[in-house]
Amino acid sequence: MDKNYYKEYYVLEREHWWFKARAKIISNLIFKSLKNKEKNKLNILNIGAATGKTSDILSEFGTVTSLEYDKDCCDFTNSALNLNSIHGSILALPFREEEFDMVCALDVIEHVEDDMLGVSEMKRVCKSGGLIVVTVPAFMLLWSKHDEVNHHFRRYTMSSLKKIFTKINLTTIRATYFNTILFIPILAFRLLSKLIPTKFIRVGAGSDATLHNNNSISSKILYQIFKSELALLKLFNLPLGVSIFIISSKK
């Protein structure tokens, strides 16, 4: 893929309203779940690191090892950004058993056909008592050309995601939907987007970013709306949303 794409995606991960608000929510949910663990001394594996923003988020909790399946993306980030990403697949993680305190796959397992194997591999390299963090897109009702362009195999419900974790004997600490307030507008947009030619849908854009100027008033409003869910998530789990967050422990 053209290196300019990775440069654009690097900016997108750091400036687009969806990525920015998502980062704050995921960081907060992880922080609240750590409890008595040393919150800045964990050995962390970040699967699907892309251009490194999620690794930046996770670095507040400890030392992060970044893994990325896209070889061209690895080459770009390692040469241009000095991020030291490792090329590898979630289906065959190149690490020994019980190596990490926390293993994360943020919007990753929907990209692999055998998601059960992917989560099993996460469990294998996670220490006993360690944490496994996953986020995924929710509800096939929201399926659109965006999912097709980004090579998704599926979207999840809470029950379908929890079923995977239960089958491989992981204990759920917290599971919640998020990006809830914008669920109806995004549903409407996704339905309308079926009329948009696939070539105009940006690969990797979590919220169909081609239609938003990152500095526009609308983007700033959307960011504040999405970020406002932090207050709700401090009180309770959300009953539906565009995405799902789950954090589990390995016995």
Question: Positions of the model-derived regions?
Answer:
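Residues lining the SAM
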Residues: 106-109, 135
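A short glycine-rich, Lys/Arg-flanked "PGG" loop and its adjoining helix->strand segment in the class I
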Residues: 116-131
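Core SAM-dependent methyltransferase catalytic element
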Residues: 190, 194, 238-251
